């Protein structure tokens, strides 16, 4: 069983912002596998389904980004999911737009949502899909809560689809295979 967590902030004003990439990827996986994310529990919205023979729980925490660990630990404990089977998808400023990076473990890298998840799980050993949003020329908060330009949006839509495939690959083939397949791929305008 896998817990697939997309990080983001709830509310219409955050829809399609850089910081909500995790929510967008989870929505793509949900659509592909006909999973309705319509239940409220674990301080978030979630739905259950299958990828092949694996049961998956798709979770969108409603705690706001910096408290995402509260939602993740509740769902993980309820379903008794191993940390190695918790996949977290989130935006990453240290990666260029058009790229993603799959990792099996690692530090928070300055991302407060991941930092909070690491604190609650008491571990940094969980797979993640880091989706590049590029470096800001402006205030970081304004940047991550801002929307992509039209040209960037074209690239991001393709990256979101690729990120969903990377999540699915982790479930079906394992983290190493997903890393080999998706790390280093760059989508251009």
UniProtKB/Swiss-Prot annotation:
The record marks 91 as: Stabilizes the basic form of H active site to accept a proton. GO terms for molecular function: peptidyl-tRNA hydrolase activity; tRNA binding. CDD domains: PTH. GO terms for cellular component: cytoplasm. It is found in: Cytoplasm. Coiled coil: none annotated. Its EC number is 3.1.1.29. The active site is at residue 19. Pfam families: Pept_tRNA_hydro (PF01195). It catalyses: an N-acyl-L-alpha-aminoacyl-tRNA + H2O = an N-acyl-L-amino acid + a tRNA + H(+). TRNA binds at residues 14, 64, 66, 112. It is an enzyme of class 3 (hydrolase). The keyword tRNA processing does not apply. Monomer. Hydrolyzes ribosome-free peptidyl-tRNAs (with 1 or more amino acids incorporated), which drop off the ribosome during protein synthesis, or as a result of ribosome stalling. Belongs to the PTH family. This is Peptidyl-tRNA hydrolase.
